[in-house]
């Protein structure tokens, strides 16, 4: 099943959903342990030479994503909410120093236990509808959908 986006006209959010063919505990582990995240984050051909995660409220997630052409994007996130294995929320920090970066948003991922399957719902909450629209214009959805496709393949390998 593909990642499905919903963009409400009257709310500064992007909502994406997907069903994973894996139990919730395994999906949670793959999303919260750096050794796993480094294997699937980013689109095809991307790698993650640095992925350090302190998964607790206030904890830092430091990430360097290498594009297929070799250039790197450094990202830092702070975890806002951690409720294993149900909810995980984070916000990028330091993005203002990065020229041309996406507008800041709070990402909240909810995992629904469906037995041997897991319902995944991501809500990206922006400060305003114009910021949300700017993120959409910059291609916000594509990389998340591509990462989710890689996560599907990675979960099959576990």
Residue spans of the language-model regions?
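A short, structured loop/turn motif at beta-sheet edges
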Residues: 24-25, 55-56, 80-87, 110-119
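Short, highly charged C-terminal tails/helix-capping segments
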Residues: 50, 156-158
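Short beta-edge strand/loop motif at the mouth of beta-sheet-based domains
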Residues: 15, 35-72
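Hydrophobic ligand-binding cavity/cleft-lining segments
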Residues: 1-47
């Amino acid at each position: 099943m593909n990642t499905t986006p919903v963009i409400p006209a009257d709310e500064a959010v992007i909502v994406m959903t997907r069903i994973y063919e894996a139990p919730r505990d395994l999906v949670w582990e793959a999303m919260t342990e750096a050794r796993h995240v480094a294997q699937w984050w980013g689109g095809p051909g991307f790698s993650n030479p640095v992925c350090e995660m302190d998964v607790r409220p206030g904890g830092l997630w430091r990430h360097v994503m290498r594009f297929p052409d070799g250039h790197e994007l450094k990202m830092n996130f702070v975890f806002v909410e951690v409720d294993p294995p149900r909810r995980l929320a984070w916000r990028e920090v330091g993005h203002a120093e990065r020229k041309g970066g996406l507008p800041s948003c709070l990402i909240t991922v909810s995992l629904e236990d469906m037995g041997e399957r897991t319902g995944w719902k991501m809500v990206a909450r922006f400060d305003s509808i114009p910021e949300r629209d700017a993120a959409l214009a910059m291609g916000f959805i594509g990389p998340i959908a591509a990462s989710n496709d890689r996560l599907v393949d990675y979960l099959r390998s576990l």
